A protein has these predicted regions:
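Conserved SGNH/GDSL esterase-like catalytic core that processes O-acyl groups on lipids
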Residues: 2, 7, 15-108
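Short intrinsically disordered, low-complexity coil segments enriched in acidic
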Residues: 1-2, 9, 125, 163
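Alpha-helical cap/lid subdomain in secreted, periplasmic
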Residues: 63-163
């Protein structure tokens, strides 16, 4: 895919936002734009999750991916979605099952998110990235003490719904 001159909208969490990068110019979105000749629009917010939480606060990190789709520039040529690690790490939404269609389970939120993206960006390429490996990826109790599935199950859900 030739990206030169195209606009790529990146929807994600702290990794997309650039937390940990040595400077703004070294966020992966900016490096991608430099290497491809594209224009990067960064919609990353640290701590955010794909699924909605049971109790939503005014904090930025409670603005799940589904809440933010309408804020994305609809003229983008390509959309990249990179999330799921915070759903595993500290979310309170259960993973659910493939047939779910609610933002309150991970599977359901994926279905809702991909449907919203397809409606907002018809005929555009949508690329879905799975979470990076973590040291604690096999735990079944997350950082907030809430039962969860191992990270591999979140990766499988992302792949399954994206297909």
């Amino acid at each position: 895919m030739d990206i030169a001159g195209k606009t790529v909208a990146f929807l994600g969490d702290s990794i997309t936002e650039g937390v940990g990068a040595s400077c703004v110019e070294n966020r992966y979105t900016d490096v991608f734009a430099r290497l491809t000749g594209g224009v990067a629009l960064n919609y990353g917010i640290s701590g955010t999750r794909i699924a909605r939480q049971k109790v939503v606060t005014e904090d930025l990190f409670d603005r799940d991916f589904n809440m933010r789709v309408e804020e994305m520039d609809a003229s983008a040529d390509v959309v990249v979605v990179f999330g799921g690690t915070n759903d595993f790490g500290h979310g309170d939404a259960p993973i659910g099952k493939f047939t779910d269609n609610t933002v309150y389970t991970f599977y359901g939120a994926l279905h809702v998110l991909y449907r919203q993206l397809l409606e907002r960006f018809p005929e555009k390429d949508i690329i879905v990235l799975t979470p990076l490996h973590r040291l604690s990826e096999n735990v079944t109790i997350n950082e907030r003490g809430i039962p969860c599935e191992p990270l591999k199950k979140y990766v499988e859900a992302i792949r399954e719904v994206a297909e």
